[in-house]
Amino acid sequence: MSSSICVASSRLSLPTLLRNVCRSEFTADLGPRSEYKSFFAMQRAALAYRRIRGPRQFSSLTLADDIPTTSKQPPSRAANVSSVSQPGEPTKTGAGEIRASSHPSEVVSSSPRADSAKRKKASAPEATAGAKPAANESSDKKRSEAPRKSSLSILSKSKKKKEPWQIQKEALKKKFKEGWNPPKKLSPDALEGIRHLHAVAPDRFTTPVLAEQFQVSPEAIRRILKSKWRPSPEEMEKRRERWERRHDRIWSQMTELGLRRPKRSAEKFSDVKVLYDKPV
């Protein structure tokens, strides 16, 4: 049998191996001069990496050695890492990133600072664009909810049936604008005079005329004429005394203001007596 000679083994020689080892150590000692790699050097290094990746392709080392590399790791160590890593996994270097794929043209190289800057630039317009529609949607919702609430409140008020006492209260407010305790109060003599005038000449002393004359509401005159209640003699006497005290109190107040002359019956209601007749 004729011995078969390997072509790749025949190409290997001692001078070639020594030259490759010396060049790899020299490039490792030099190290990278700049922190950032150039795209051209990274591309050529990736091509050399793909050629080294194949089994028994030692001839490609000569082509890789002719190219000056800027990697921080020595080629021998890179070759060991490449042999251990799988073909589909990416390999990381000091300043960049090389992703190996099945397609030879897919070589991605980028720096962390450049990637972060690109991400910030891309996220800034997206954030502003996302915030504006959200604000517009919230304002539109508020505007749409406001008329809904107002219309619902109006409908609920209109649909809700009022109680009898509420209807009566509204009617009394329209009739008695001054309320149940008006400042103008009619004395018992005035009440009897209103009844007497209306009984003598009802066509002449009508309700509006009497209301204008006594300065009260027409509803008050109507109720006075309509009421059939009459006080007893005892109640009339109590009422007369009460109205006399009221008259003297008002007279004393007007005397203090200088509008009326002093009166003996009104002296007991004066504030002067309350202030100066206190026991020491």
Curated annotation (Swiss-Prot):
Residues 101-114, 124-135 have a biased composition (Low complexity). Residues 63-166 are annotated as: Disordered. Residues 138-148 have a biased composition (Basic and acidic residues). Residues 63-88 have a biased composition (Polar residues). Residues 1-45 form a transit peptide. Its main location: mitochondrion. Pfam families: Neugrin. GO terms for cellular component: mitochondrion; nucleus. It is found in: Mitochondrion. Keywords: Mitochondrion, Transit peptide. Belongs to the RRG9 family. PANTHER family: NEUGRIN (PTHR13475:SF3). Required for respiratory activity and maintenance and expression of the mitochondrial genome. This is Required for respiratory growth protein 9, mitochondrial. It comes from Aspergillus fumigatus (strain ATCC MYA-4609 / CBS 101355 / FGSC A1100 / Af293) (Neosartorya fumigata). The lineage of its organism: Eukaryota, Fungi, Dikarya, Ascomycota, Pezizomycotina.
